[in-house]
Amino acid sequence: MLPMLVFFACSKGGKDMHFGIISDTTIRLSADDTQAEIDIEANVDWAVTGGKDWCKPDVVRGSGDRKVKLTIKPNTTSGSRDVTLTVGSVLGSVDIYVEQAGVTTGYAEGAYKAAETNRQTNPVNIVIMGDGFTAADLEQGGAYDQAMDRAREAFFDIEPFKSYRNYFNVYYVYAESEDRGATYGWGYDGSTKLTFAFTERNTAFKATFSTSANSTATSCNYQKVFDYARKIPAIKVGADIVLKPDGNIQSGAISDVNNVINKTLIILVINDTRYAGTCVMYPTGAAIGMCPMSTAVGNMSFEATLRHEAGGHGFGKFTDEYIYYPGAIPQTDASGYSVNEIQQWQGLGFYKNMSTVKTKAGAPEEWQPFLDNAAIYPEVGFFEGGCTYALGIWRAESNSIMNDNVPYFNGPQRYFIYNRIKTIAGEAPTWADFRTRDVQATPSQLNAFTAMARANESGFIPLGRPIMMDMPL
């Protein structure tokens, strides 16, 4: 900034007199600045008045040219402060405005923090970050923190995550967007039956809702999400992750199934009220659950969406159990669910919540102990329909979170989640150990979930299928 020159001059008795300030008359300081100066040019007497305890001139009177030093105390408060000093002489006076900013209480772009640390050795890591939050939202305890806290509590407010919370470490990563919200390719919100115009918003991770009508599909800049997750030292292990333009794996740590990124769940909270959500999953285990902050209630709320996308798809590696089509699931289908696709993903440890055959021997291994203990788990069996088809595919219970977002993981789903938690933690999972901490739904709760499913048949909007990268077909 150029200095603001304020100058007075006159002649008296044949003598020229002058007085002026040749430095800036507005001084702006950061919270930790400790000095400033006022540059006086004069051949007359002058005086400085108006100082405060935190802003004191080194001299208050003088004559002639002088650079008056201002001693500034650091501002340890969050609020800014200001003072006006006046430099006066017989020729006139000049006000000097001094403003000092408060301590910055916001998080820096790209900063991270450990929000919850439960284990020092072999923790199960969750990284939560937000898109569509501006600088004003990144204040400590502000909208960004509140959204991350809400996501974290929603994730753990369901079994079995609730019982095994002490196995998890949770991190927040802070990202600043120019705009709030997300880009609307097609603005239909199934929860409100409203259609919004195409809107492009400048956000950190470019969260975008589908261009397809009536779709809840969501996408983002997956490369940048992984880059930000790896700002955390505990996650930044191995070579930099490089994805292809379409989001599939090119190289780096994500290629190694044993790398920590493939044992870490990433949740992207999108600062938009639309009901939508999608999980992108990689065959090596990495996953990003994209969850807008839906203002819908019940099974289409933000919390319900997050548990389905992040807890069910992202961590559990489950597929969808809802039904769109009245016929049988095809053997092959390049654009949708098929028997071949499900079986191949099951070979990689995914989609274990569905069975492509109605036989105990052919069902996923996580179902076996439940089928062997029908007296203890009478709710578990073969229930036809799932993966969008009514026939030729079976789920383990009448209803679960992977159907219509009810707050319930069924028995085999809980067992698979338990197995994954224990394995990541370096502990051996066993059926006996699982049974000691399993929180089984009561018959009345199960009846309520079934009733909820029937009630939702007309009004519930199922979330779109997950994005499966590097599909094995």
Predicted features along the sequence, with ranges:
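Active-site-proximal segment of zinc-dependent metalloprotease catalytic domains
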Residues: 107-122, 129-133, 153-325
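Solvent-exposed, low-complexity, repeat-rich "mucin-like" stalks and linkers
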Residues: 12-15, 22-49
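N-terminal low-structure segments adjacent to metalloprotease catalytic domains
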Residues: 11-14, 102-199, 411-473
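A short beta-strand micro-motif common to beta-rich folds, especially ectodomain repeats
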Residues: 78-90
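Bacterial Sec-dependent N-terminal signal peptides
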Residues: 6-26, 90, 95-97, 101-105
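Surface-exposed binding patches on compact interaction domains or structured appendages
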Residues: 17-20, 41-69
